[in-house]
Amino acid sequence: MKRKCQDYESRLPDNTAVKQQQLPAFRLQLTASEILSGFFAIGLFCLGMGIILLLSAKSIKEVEINYTEKCATCAKLREEATNFDKECNCSISFYLPQKMEGNVYLYYKLYGFYQNLYRYILSRSNIQLVGADVKDVRNCAPFRTSDNGLPIAPCGAIANSMFNDTIVLWYNFNSSTHIRVPMVRTETAWWTDKYVKFQNPAFQNLSSAFAGTAKPPNWPKPVYELDENDPGNNGFINDDFIVWMRTAAFPNFKKLYRRLHRIGNFTEGLPAGSYSFIINYNFPVSRFQGQKAVVLSTLTWSGGSSLFLALAYLVTGAVTLLASFSMMALHLKLKERKTFFLQ
């Protein structure tokens, strides 16, 4: 019997704080006043951030010009597929009442274009876009190969539907002097997209790298000729192409097109005065009953003119404060009842 007791005791864990699970621990016991203070602090913080973000968004200067109806003649021309090789330009004049100081950004905006459709998003080849194999078109239905059987580069529905209007901004200094506003067409894409997700094939000559492939059906030129003025902005690393390939979550969206080159008369930004947009109309929107617009905008430390983040903070802060006052009222009521019974 004694031996059995010794065997049993030998199997017991050591009598230490760790093995006996007797380590000292801090057990947080929050009081009602501490919880209410935390809720009030969170609510006030969210309200304060919402007000700051709202004021920041309101300080942004933005001009949006819808040119769907103003370029109706060109739109009608583009409805016929046989007119794809006919050039059509339209001019849109507007007046800028106040100077847009600092960096100014030019966007194109589409209404009613659903880039978030499941089959549309999947219609691309990431293997092709990183330059590993320009003939990889496995996931690009229905735009895999051309009528001649050649693999399309870049393939897929996203690339084929790329926005291809050409937008030029002119400053009408006076009735006889018109100055083209200098714009930068690079550094408009995300850094990770430009240098990680999109790469050209490892060839010095891009035309040779894309030999044996065909351009997308809706494109007027192959991918290695997208920028005739800058050889370093051609192929899969073209900024306009990369920006378009980052699909939007909502049917109404804007994408960065150009940045103001702050030189000459535009060192401090866009001066107030008369301007004109000359648009080479190529992208049809009547087929899906959409609309097109150009947007000139400045930015602040908080980003663009979207009010979503500011409203989200304001709503969160308001709901939190409302809950705080409700809990405080309930706490005081229960406290009074407890005091009454103790008496």
From Swiss-Prot:
Where found, per UniProt? Answer: Membrane
Q: Which regions of this chain are Cytoplasmic-facing, per the record's topological domains?
A: 1-34, 328-343
The main location class comes to: membrane
| TM stretches of this protein | 35-55, 307-327
Membrane topology according to the record: Multi-pass membrane protein
Q: Which GO terms describe its biological process?
A: phospholipid translocation
The cellular component terms of Gene Ontology attached to this UniProt record, alphabetical and capped at eight, are: endoplasmic reticulum; Golgi apparatus; plasma membrane
Domain of life of the organism encoding this protein: Eukaryota
**Know the name of this protein?**
Cell cycle control protein 50C
From what organism does this protein derive? Answer: Bos taurus
